[in-house]
């Protein structure tokens, strides 16, 4: 059982956050799982976190569900509240990888509000050529039976990603936290290019 002082230490423990940024199909989820497992970090997918809250009918989940039922987007403040709660878990003691958040500059600035407790350490930007990305996602759609991905829809998503994340990357670049990762090629090679920044 932790002592009073250990509890106080836990409260002030700095869990460093590592952000994985990249367009859909860039392979960031695959690498996040591998890196998290190797270095004892928590892998936090904001999409999974949101679904878990809704499925478990938590207070935050109920708010999120009512917002989504009205066809609205869940607010950044609500996602941050879920994130703060998640980061308080024991598996986050060594730090965490954020997969899917932040996606925009306002979200990054919301994350700054909790930086004294959970500072952002590194931001990995997964870079993939648009045509390579289109082929990857179309191939994935064929093998998984997903037919909702068309070349046009993928290109639109890539364009939105680029527009949203360019200011975000600039924001973290100014803090010297950005590492650009060539996300084309062998999965193990890409993994080692990321892992060397954790050693």
Model-derived features: where do they sit?
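Glycine-rich phosphate-binding loop of ATP-dependent small-molecule kinases
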Residues: 1-199
């Amino acid at each position: 059982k932790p002592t009073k002082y250990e509890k106080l230490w836990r409260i002030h423990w700095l869990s460093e956050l590592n952000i994985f940024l990249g367009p859909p199909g860039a392979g960031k989820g695959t690498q996040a799982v591998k890196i998290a497992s190797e270095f004892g970090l928590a892998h936090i997918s904001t999409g999974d976190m949101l679904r878990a809250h809704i499925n478990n009918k938590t207070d935050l989940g109920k708010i999120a569900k009512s917002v989504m039922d009205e066809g609205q987007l869940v607010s950044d403040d609500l996602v941050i509240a879920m994130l703060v709660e998640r980061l308080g878990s024991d598996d986050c003691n060594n730090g965490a990888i954020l997969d899917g958040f932040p996606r925009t500059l306002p979200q990054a600035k919301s994350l700054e509000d909790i930086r004294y407790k959970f500072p952002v350490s590194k931001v990995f930007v997964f870079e993939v050529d648009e045509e390579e990305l289109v082929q990857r996602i179309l191939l994935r759609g064929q093998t998984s039976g997903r037919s909702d991905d068309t070349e046009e829809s993928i290109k639109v998503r890539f364009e939105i990603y680029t527009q949203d994340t360019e200011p975000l990357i600039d924001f973290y670049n100014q803090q010297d936290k950005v590492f650009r990762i060539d996300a084309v090629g062998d999965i193990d090679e890409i993994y080692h290019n990321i892992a060397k920044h954790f050693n």
